[in-house]
Amino acid sequence: MSYGRPPPDVEGMTSLKVDNLTYRTSPDTLRRVFEKYGRVGDVYIPRDRYTKESRGFAFVRFHDKRDAEDAMDAMDGAVLDGRELRVQMARYGRPPDSHHSRRGPPPRRYGGGGYGRRSRSPRRRRRSRSRSRSRSRSRSRSRYSRSKSRSRTRSRSRSTSKSRSARRSKSKSSSVSRSRSRSRSRSRSRSPPPVSKRESKSRSRSKSPPKSPEEEGAVSS
Protein backbone atom coordinates (compact mmCIF):
# COMPACT_ATOMS: atom_id res chain seq x y z
CA MET A 1 0.00 0.00 0.00
CA SER A 2 1.49 3.35 -1.02
CA TYR A 3 1.06 6.40 1.26
CA GLY A 4 1.39 8.99 -1.53
CA ARG A 5 -1.97 8.25 -3.18
CA PRO A 6 -5.26 9.43 -1.69
CA PRO A 7 -7.32 6.91 0.28
CA PRO A 8 -9.62 4.72 -1.82
CA ASP A 9 -13.37 4.89 -1.69
CA VAL A 10 -14.43 2.64 1.22
CA GLU A 11 -18.16 3.23 1.03
CA GLY A 12 -20.11 -0.02 1.13
CA MET A 13 -17.17 -1.95 2.63
CA THR A 14 -17.14 -3.73 6.01
CA SER A 15 -14.28 -2.63 8.27
CA LEU A 16 -12.46 -4.76 10.83
CA LYS A 17 -10.32 -3.24 13.56
CA VAL A 18 -7.16 -5.21 14.34
CA ASP A 19 -5.51 -4.37 17.70
CA ASN A 20 -2.23 -5.35 19.41
CA LEU A 21 0.01 -5.00 16.36
CA THR A 22 3.78 -4.65 16.50
CA TYR A 23 5.61 -1.65 15.08
CA ARG A 24 7.13 -3.73 12.31
CA THR A 25 3.83 -5.14 10.97
CA SER A 26 3.19 -3.62 7.53
CA PRO A 27 -0.06 -3.18 5.54
CA ASP A 28 1.19 -5.70 2.94
CA THR A 29 1.58 -8.36 5.66
CA LEU A 30 -1.97 -7.76 6.90
CA ARG A 31 -3.33 -7.90 3.35
CA ARG A 32 -1.68 -11.27 2.67
CA VAL A 33 -3.06 -12.71 5.93
CA PHE A 34 -6.64 -11.45 5.53
CA GLU A 35 -6.99 -12.11 1.79
CA LYS A 36 -7.32 -15.81 2.64
CA TYR A 37 -10.91 -15.15 3.75
CA GLY A 38 -12.12 -12.87 0.95
CA ARG A 39 -11.47 -9.84 -1.23
CA VAL A 40 -9.78 -7.06 0.74
CA GLY A 41 -10.53 -3.52 -0.42
CA ASP A 42 -8.18 -1.51 1.80
CA VAL A 43 -5.71 -1.84 4.69
CA TYR A 44 -4.96 1.25 6.80
CA ILE A 45 -2.48 1.52 9.71
CA PRO A 46 -2.69 4.87 11.58
CA ARG A 47 0.74 6.35 12.30
CA ASP A 48 2.04 9.01 14.63
CA ARG A 49 2.19 12.45 13.04
CA TYR A 50 5.74 13.19 14.20
CA THR A 51 7.51 9.84 14.54
CA LYS A 52 5.64 8.14 11.65
CA GLU A 53 5.53 4.94 13.69
CA SER A 54 2.57 2.59 13.89
CA ARG A 55 0.06 3.28 16.65
CA GLY A 56 -0.49 -0.45 17.23
CA PHE A 57 -3.79 -1.01 15.41
CA ALA A 58 -5.11 -1.18 11.83
CA PHE A 59 -8.32 -1.23 9.76
CA VAL A 60 -8.95 -3.98 7.19
CA ARG A 61 -11.89 -3.46 4.76
CA PHE A 62 -13.70 -6.24 2.93
CA HIS A 63 -16.04 -5.84 -0.02
CA ASP A 64 -18.30 -8.58 1.32
CA LYS A 65 -19.65 -8.55 4.86
CA ARG A 66 -19.61 -12.35 5.08
CA ASP A 67 -15.90 -12.45 4.26
CA ALA A 68 -15.26 -9.90 7.00
CA GLU A 69 -17.18 -12.01 9.54
CA ASP A 70 -15.22 -15.14 8.55
CA ALA A 71 -11.92 -13.28 8.87
CA MET A 72 -12.92 -11.93 12.28
CA ASP A 73 -13.82 -15.40 13.59
CA ALA A 74 -10.58 -16.90 12.28
CA MET A 75 -8.07 -14.15 13.13
CA ASP A 76 -9.36 -13.09 16.55
CA GLY A 77 -6.77 -14.54 18.96
CA ALA A 78 -4.32 -15.53 16.19
CA VAL A 79 -0.61 -14.76 16.63
CA LEU A 80 1.12 -12.42 14.14
CA ASP A 81 4.73 -11.24 14.54
CA GLY A 82 4.73 -12.59 18.10
CA ARG A 83 1.55 -10.77 19.14
CA GLU A 84 -1.94 -12.15 19.82
CA LEU A 85 -4.35 -10.19 17.64
CA ARG A 86 -7.72 -8.83 18.75
CA VAL A 87 -10.12 -8.48 15.82
CA GLN A 88 -13.58 -6.90 16.00
CA MET A 89 -16.02 -4.95 13.86
CA ALA A 90 -15.03 -1.30 13.50
CA ARG A 91 -17.58 1.11 14.93
CA TYR A 92 -16.41 4.22 13.11
CA GLY A 93 -15.30 5.04 9.62
CA ARG A 94 -11.77 5.70 8.46
CA PRO A 95 -10.08 8.62 10.24
CA PRO A 96 -8.80 11.49 8.05
CA ASP A 97 -5.17 11.37 6.88
CA SER A 98 -2.56 13.86 8.03
CA HIS A 99 -2.18 15.53 4.58
CA HIS A 100 -5.90 16.27 4.52
CA SER A 101 -5.74 17.94 7.93
CA ARG A 102 -2.86 20.20 6.79
CA ARG A 103 -4.89 21.80 3.99
CA GLY A 104 -7.26 23.75 6.22
CA PRO A 105 -7.83 24.71 9.83
CA PRO A 106 -9.72 22.28 12.04
CA PRO A 107 -13.49 22.70 12.18
CA ARG A 108 -14.74 25.18 14.71
CA ARG A 109 -16.57 23.63 17.60
CA TYR A 110 -17.64 26.88 19.22
CA GLY A 111 -19.48 29.88 17.83
CA GLY A 112 -17.98 33.32 17.23
CA GLY A 113 -14.75 34.42 15.62
CA GLY A 114 -11.30 33.06 16.37
CA TYR A 115 -10.63 30.03 18.49
CA GLY A 116 -13.19 29.11 21.10
CA ARG A 117 -10.64 27.99 23.66
CA ARG A 118 -8.89 31.39 23.77
CA SER A 119 -12.18 33.27 24.04
CA ARG A 120 -13.32 31.04 26.89
CA SER A 121 -10.07 31.09 28.85
CA PRO A 122 -10.63 34.52 30.57
CA ARG A 123 -14.15 33.48 31.53
CA ARG A 124 -12.81 30.32 33.10
CA ARG A 125 -10.17 32.34 34.95
CA ARG A 126 -12.81 34.76 36.21
CA ARG A 127 -14.99 31.88 37.32
CA SER A 128 -12.07 30.21 39.07
CA ARG A 129 -11.15 33.50 40.78
CA SER A 130 -14.73 34.09 41.92
CA ARG A 131 -14.94 30.51 43.16
CA SER A 132 -11.66 30.88 45.07
CA ARG A 133 -12.86 34.17 46.59
CA SER A 134 -16.19 32.65 47.62
CA ARG A 135 -14.37 29.68 49.10
CA SER A 136 -11.99 31.94 51.06
CA ARG A 137 -14.93 34.02 52.32
CA SER A 138 -16.83 30.91 53.38
CA ARG A 139 -13.71 29.60 55.12
CA SER A 140 -13.17 32.92 56.97
CA ARG A 141 -16.83 32.97 57.98
CA SER A 142 -16.65 29.43 59.25
CA ARG A 143 -13.48 30.26 61.21
CA TYR A 144 -15.13 33.39 62.68
CA SER A 145 -18.24 31.42 63.67
CA ARG A 146 -16.03 28.72 65.21
CA SER A 147 -14.11 31.31 67.28
CA LYS A 148 -17.42 32.86 68.40
CA SER A 149 -18.83 29.50 69.44
CA ARG A 150 -15.60 28.68 71.29
CA SER A 151 -15.65 32.01 73.18
CA ARG A 152 -19.31 31.46 74.07
CA THR A 153 -18.63 27.97 75.35
CA ARG A 154 -15.65 29.27 77.38
CA SER A 155 -17.73 32.08 78.92
CA ARG A 156 -20.50 29.61 79.70
CA SER A 157 -18.07 27.22 81.34
CA ARG A 158 -16.57 30.07 83.39
CA SER A 159 -20.01 31.26 84.54
CA THR A 160 -21.01 27.71 85.45
CA SER A 161 -17.76 27.24 87.39
CA LYS A 162 -18.34 30.54 89.24
CA SER A 163 -21.91 29.58 90.12
CA ARG A 164 -20.70 26.19 91.30
CA SER A 165 -18.01 27.78 93.52
CA ALA A 166 -20.58 30.23 94.96
CA ARG A 167 -22.93 27.36 95.70
CA ARG A 168 -20.13 25.41 97.35
CA SER A 169 -19.13 28.41 99.54
CA LYS A 170 -22.76 28.97 100.55
CA SER A 171 -23.18 25.31 101.44
CA LYS A 172 -19.94 25.38 103.46
CA SER A 173 -21.01 28.51 105.40
CA SER A 174 -24.45 27.03 106.11
CA SER A 175 -22.88 23.78 107.31
CA VAL A 176 -20.47 25.72 109.59
CA SER A 177 -23.32 27.77 111.08
CA ARG A 178 -25.34 24.61 111.64
CA SER A 179 -22.44 22.89 113.40
CA ARG A 180 -21.92 25.95 115.64
CA SER A 181 -25.60 26.08 116.59
CA ARG A 182 -25.55 22.36 117.36
CA SER A 183 -22.47 22.69 119.61
CA ARG A 184 -24.06 25.60 121.49
CA SER A 185 -27.29 23.66 122.05
CA ARG A 186 -25.31 20.66 123.32
CA SER A 187 -23.29 22.78 125.78
CA ARG A 188 -26.45 24.37 127.11
CA SER A 189 -28.13 21.00 127.64
CA ARG A 190 -25.09 19.63 129.51
CA SER A 191 -24.73 22.56 132.01
CA PRO A 192 -26.99 22.19 135.20
CA PRO A 193 -29.82 24.69 135.67
CA PRO A 194 -29.20 27.62 138.09
CA VAL A 195 -30.39 27.14 141.70
CA SER A 196 -32.54 29.83 143.31
CA LYS A 197 -31.68 31.47 146.72
CA ARG A 198 -34.65 30.00 148.52
CA GLU A 199 -33.81 26.49 147.46
CA SER A 200 -30.22 26.96 148.60
CA LYS A 201 -31.33 28.21 152.08
CA SER A 202 -33.76 25.35 152.56
CA ARG A 203 -31.08 22.92 151.58
CA SER A 204 -28.62 24.42 154.04
CA ARG A 205 -31.15 24.23 156.87
CA SER A 206 -32.00 20.64 156.13
CA LYS A 207 -28.33 19.74 156.05
CA SER A 208 -27.55 21.21 159.55
CA PRO A 209 -27.35 18.45 162.41
CA PRO A 210 -30.09 18.22 165.09
CA LYS A 211 -29.45 19.89 168.49
CA SER A 212 -28.87 17.87 171.72
CA PRO A 213 -31.24 18.10 174.79
CA GLU A 214 -28.66 19.97 176.76
CA GLU A 215 -28.42 22.60 174.11
CA GLU A 216 -32.17 22.86 173.97
CA GLY A 217 -32.34 23.31 177.79
CA ALA A 218 -29.75 26.01 177.77
CA VAL A 219 -31.65 27.79 175.17
CA SER A 220 -34.88 27.54 177.08
CA SER A 221 -33.26 28.80 180.40
Swiss-Prot record:
The modification N-acetylserine is found at S2. It is found in: Nucleus; Nucleus, Nucleoplasm; Nucleus speckle. The keyword Nucleus applies. It comes from the Eukaryota. Interacts with BRDT. In vitro, self-associates and binds SRSF1/SFRS1 (ASF/SF2), SNRNP70 and U2AF1 but not U2AF2. Binds SREK1/SFRS12. Interacts with CCNL1 and CCNL2. Interacts with SCAF11. Interacts with ZRSR2/U2AF1-RS2. Interacts with CCDC55 (via C-terminus). This is Serine/arginine-rich splicing factor 2. GO terms for biological process: mRNA processing; regulation of alternative mRNA splicing, via spliceosome; RNA splicing. The lineage of its organism: Eukaryota, Metazoa, Chordata, Craniata, Vertebrata. SUPFAM superfamilies: RNA-binding domain, RBD. The modification N6-acetyllysine is found at K52.
